[in-house]
């Protein structure tokens, strides 16, 4: 059977994008190697901002819906020394991820999308030298004018491509966060975790879960799950968390690196975790992927209309829209955060005390970063090493942001832009560079 689009991967990015495409009148097949019963079972609970429902046209999850647990509306932050509470008001829904995906899939199917589980991608299918579908591990040929990689961190389709406009890098141990979650029962019945509190210095947090009197204690770390467990011990030794009994643990990975410089080439688009689309401050991926997907659906539909083939040129606007918007903002933030965590707990405490980088909603923005940091150095509250690290990282982040805002309109100008972007990212380094105790 022929399709307009085949999507490899049926989690949040692939399922959401499928629904957008069928609403544009396209014939869409979504495949996933997992069974429907085991899909996305690596994590149970997620925290999803309620503003995202309206932003992305998704029916809100409410009490009585099987995926819904509860809402909360405050996210707190504290320094490495557990001081200077920051308060940010964000409406958040606590959801069961597998059931949330199930509801997204139900909507997509009702709108005309097809799903097949237990079906794995083996290689791309070509006609006249152009992508024309996929071949499964079972040897089945699925014809389609366009292929979308939503396969997650493995990025099985993107990594199989050999194309000057598509990077085939692997998201390795230095390029992702290994997330360790402890589901716990609090010993004191008078202590309730009803909102989220994070300690960014330790990449640690405590947040609500689905059982009464319970909480989730989590950390994220580069390199390995073993190192994440070491970071968890360091976090719990430094921060006085409520006493608890461990119920069970979950472990998963999220990309933590720059996305590909181009998401498209002839007959192809990469989205979601396969494109390393996550929020630098906390690793959240669903809204970041959907920011890319929302305009991309109309661009893909236009490229495929009247039986047309989706060339790189027709799809290029997907690149430009994302990279000059969220891509530019996140490039700057990702580079700056490298400097923000590469310091001592005392340095981090100074940032919190003065609302530098980490601030409450009602605190003013720091107008002159260098002046504020120099005052800290003179007062003996902020180290010269941290000053150099943070100012350098901020400059590198600003350079990256400005470069992304100049993303080329024409694919012919892409190689020169990408060459400079490589150079800027090599200067900025990686969050894994800050690891000193692995």
List PLM regions with ranges.
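Predominantly flavin-linked oxidoreductase catalytic cores and closely associated redox partners
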Residues: 10, 109-242, 276
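Short beta-strand to alpha-helix junction loop
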Residues: 86-107, 156, 222-230
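FAD/FMN-dependent oxidoreductases across multiple families
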Residues: 121-123, 141, 225-305, 310-325
């Amino acid at each position: 059977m022929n399709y307009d689009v085949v999507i490899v991967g049926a989690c949040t990015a692939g399922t959401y994008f499928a629904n957008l495409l069928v609403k544009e009148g396209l014939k869409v097949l979504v495949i996933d190697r997992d069974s429907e019963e085991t899909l996305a079972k690596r994590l149970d609970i997620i925290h999803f901002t309620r503003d995202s429902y309206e932003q992305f046209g998704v029916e809100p999850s409410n009490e009585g819906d099987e995926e819904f647990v509860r809402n909360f509306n405050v996210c707190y932050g504290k320094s490495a020394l557990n001081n200077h509470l920051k308060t940010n008001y964000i409406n958040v829904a606590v959801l069961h991820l597998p059931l949330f995906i199930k509801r997204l899939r139900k909507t997509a199917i009702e709108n005309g999308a097809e799903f097949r589980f237990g079906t794995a991608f083996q290689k791309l299918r070509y006609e006249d030298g152009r992508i024309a579908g996929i071949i499964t591990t079972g040897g089945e040929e699925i014809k389609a004018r366009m292929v979308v990689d939503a396969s997650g961190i493995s990025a099985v389709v993107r990594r199989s491509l050999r194309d000057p406009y598509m990077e085939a890098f692997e998201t390795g141990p230095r390029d992702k966060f290994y997330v360790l979650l402890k589901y716990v029962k609090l010993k004191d019945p008078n202590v309730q975790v009803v909102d989220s509190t994070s300690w960014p210095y330790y990449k640690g947090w405590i947040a609500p879960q689905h059982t009464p009197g319970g909480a989730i204690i989590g950390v994220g770390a580069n390199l390995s799950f073993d190192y994440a467990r070491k970071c968890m011990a360091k976090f719990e030794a430094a921060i006085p968390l409520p006493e608890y009994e461990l119920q069970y643990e979950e472990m998963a990975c999220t990309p933590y690196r720059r996305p590909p410089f181009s998401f498209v080439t002839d007959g192809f688009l990469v989205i979601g975790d396969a494109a390393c689309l996550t929020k630098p401050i906390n690793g959240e991926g669903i809204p970041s992927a959907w920011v890319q997907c929302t305009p991309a659906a109309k661009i893909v539909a236009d490229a495929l209309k009247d039986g047309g083939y989706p060339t790189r040129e027709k799809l290029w606007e997907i690149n430009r829209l994302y990279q000059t918007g969220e891509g530019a903002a996140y490039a700057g933030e990702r580079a700056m955060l490298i400097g923000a965590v590469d310091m001592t707990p005392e340095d981090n405490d100074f940032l919190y005390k003065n609302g530098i980088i980490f601030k409450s909603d009602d605190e003013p923005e720091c107008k002159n970063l260098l002046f504020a940091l120099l005052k800290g150095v003179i007062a003996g509250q902020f180290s010269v090493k941290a000053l150099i690290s943070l100012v350098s990282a901020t400059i590198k982040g600003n350079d990256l942001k400005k470069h992304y805002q100049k993303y080329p309109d024409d694919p012919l100008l892409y190689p020169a832009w990408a060459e400079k972007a490589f150079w800027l990212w090599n200067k900025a380094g990686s969050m894994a560079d800050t690891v000193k105790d692995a």
